[in-house]
């Protein structure tokens, strides 16, 4: 049996051997601020490397080699060339990340290092966060406007506040750049009458003004019956270079989407039947509509060679609407399928915030040092309207034909009305420092304190509740540069998670504090042969405490004494091979479990100690191989593997493991014209991408599909 610390002595010994083999050449890593002139250039089209700056892992603009944490980055062109339609598909190709989204969470939930959902795996857009409500995030919409996606694995509350125990995903959009105006038009068409029209335009308007504009419209008939979907995304930014050391950037991003409204196929006698793959059991007048608008004003000021200031003022809104029949249950006794769970829900959310940081270079005890000090403040207003307690007209469910389900219409015995509104006020102060202890050794530290006040007004009984929460988090990491292109690191960090989405905590949840987590991690990173080979290895141990659990002596009582932990290994590799071959591969292993957790079952407290949390695969792996054929043609193919996962806390229902193959082809037919072909699920594998209704429904992955694109530059 693997010990709680993953046989840490062996891990450390292995890392030390790797370190010694890399050599001990002096590798000075002096901390330098950006030059005094702030310039904007076109984004690099090359892949990300270990010497590239990663913003998700630190506010100090450190490279991956300098960061004492497991980080990775996906280039936007790389994402689009592989046919990844959304952030979740793209980021699931990075080490240890699994997409587990359902319509109830906006289709965006992720699993990382044994922790799942919006409350533990945070998603940022351009470094900013919209606080999730009812476990839902619906921005960004697609991958067209993405410059890159950065991933920081492990606790990150010291950087971004509560809700970041498993990982942080930072989606960075394309930015304005200086130079001649460049335009890029894409037309796409594929299986299920899928269509795309997209535009990317940017460049200089004057010596001081530059811009970036992205538009993308998608629509499809979908691969299930009545599975129509459509979305429109806009991303625009205007950058003003007021002086050599002062810039202002005004940006607005907006998405309007109506996703394929799909809650999966029911299990028949506990088994999946392949003939039901394209069935849709939802109602005729179903609704799933998201409208998100983000406006941001960023000010960057190079005050001196040693001091910079950055401020971001933002206004974010999200309006979401669902109206569906979500549950489909098979009765083994009567051999009948019933439809129930008629839910009508609306979210109205508004967030105003500001983040101010100062970065300065200084001396600390005679040692070169760099620090970031900052604060952020947010006010979030949220209103929930629904038909709770969700009583169906037919409590036993409506019988429907499993092969030819009649759509029917929405019906509920519970009226649709406003349930509550809340105002959440958040303030945090934070700091981060990197000090060069020697030519090879550096220490990175960070602290953060969050204050949160939640005021909830129930609109049906005119009651009011309020809760104040405080989160304290810190980290410390050591990085030893073995050579200029290799480093070994160790770090300890903490995080806090809410017992639910903070802005929508119910009165019962408001009685409890934040859950707390801590992580120990060691790792190794190395680039060889002029960056033709880059590889990383990380091992970690995470413990999360203060989970809500049923009192073993009184099943009607909830206590905050539960505990969950995970141990894991992650490895990644990028290899440039002879003859224009390129290989990218990664693999992850995690052993996640409940250490102390009781669940109430029919009024009885049942221990789930030792069970695996829901939606957590033990193993994941990804591989992608590219080949350049001459100067005009590139082909690529890849595999995605996800291990089996449990669908319920009792670990009685299981989703099987799957391996899916994808492929791509691009041909530069003319100087300014490129034709592309993407094939998803090449071998038409039928698999459960996620689950709903505690595993009674499988949300299937997309069948084999082909998509052709024409890209024109002018």
Report each predicted region and the residues it spans.
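Short acidic/polar hinge/loop motifs at secondary-structure boundaries
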Residues: 128-153
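C-terminal beta-signal and adjacent terminal beta-strands/loops
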Residues: 641-648, 666-714
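Transmembrane beta-barrel wall of Gram-negative outer-membrane proteins
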Residues: 182-184, 188-219, 224-262, 287-302
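Structural signature of Gram-negative outer-membrane beta-barrels, strongest in the C-terminal barrel
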Residues: 241-243, 349, 367-372, 376-380, ...
